[in-house]
Regions:
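C-terminal-of-GTPase-core extension/linker across diverse P-loop GTPases
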Residues: 38, 128-187
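A glycine-rich (often HGG/GG-containing) alpha/beta subdomain
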Residues: 1-130, 134, 138
Length: 187
């Protein structure tokens, strides 16, 4: 339990669902990546909590979809009541990892980055944290992409050698190829 709770809505209906319980500015007309103060209202119109609503319009959001994040007071009662109100108004609870899955399916993360999110959450040491964060930011993906491109370049040079086989020419540097294979093995 913390001082602040964050409740995230993502998907096509997130603005409609949120606006049924949020009193303040109309969220769907606000600019992306903005915060808006307002209240969450109980069904009878009584204020449950004062919140900040963060607006993240797709595709420029974590999931690639429209996203609203309510930052509320961290009371378990308040968080549970807000969740219940959202569920009654058309939301459903996300499955574990669903937001990251949506980000992956919408091309916001590659598989390595999506796996790194779970690693980051589960990290128990500074080293695990650093590695997972590096991977999540695309470090491993960039390295794999770089090595893949080098392999494709070598394959093209070897094809040239095969095409000009009778002329006894070497286009591909065998030492560099062995070095690249060593780099791949050490990953």
């Amino acid at each position: 339990m913390g001082a602040i709770g964050v409740i995230r809505l993502s998907g096509k209906q997130c603005f409609q669902v949120a606006e049924r319980v949020f009193k303040g500015k109309k969220l769907h007309v606000q600019k992306s990546h903005t915060l808006h103060f307002g209240s969450i209202l109980e069904e009878e119109g009584r204020v449950l909590d004062e919140v900040l609503a963060g607006i993240f319009k797709g595709p420029k959001s974590y999931t690639g979809e429209d996203v609203i994040e309510f930052s509320c007071h961290g009371s378990p009662y308040i968080i549970d009541r807000i969740l219940q109100l959202l569920l009654k108004n058309g939301a459903r609870l996300a499955k574990p990892g669903e937001f990251t899955l949506r980000a992956y399916l919408n091309g916001k993360l590659d598989l390595s980055q999506a796996e790194a999110v779970a690693d980051l959450i589960a990290s128990t040491s500074a080293g695990e944290h650093r590695f997972a964060l590096h991977q999540m930011r695309g470090g491993i993906s960039r390295e794999i992409s770089r090595l893949r491109q080098q392999l494709l370049d070598f394959a093209g040079l070897i094809e040239l050698e095969l095409d000009f086989g009778e002329e006894d020419v070497a286009f591909a540097d065998r030492t560099a190829l062995h070095s690249l294979v060593g780099e791949i093995r050490n990953m």
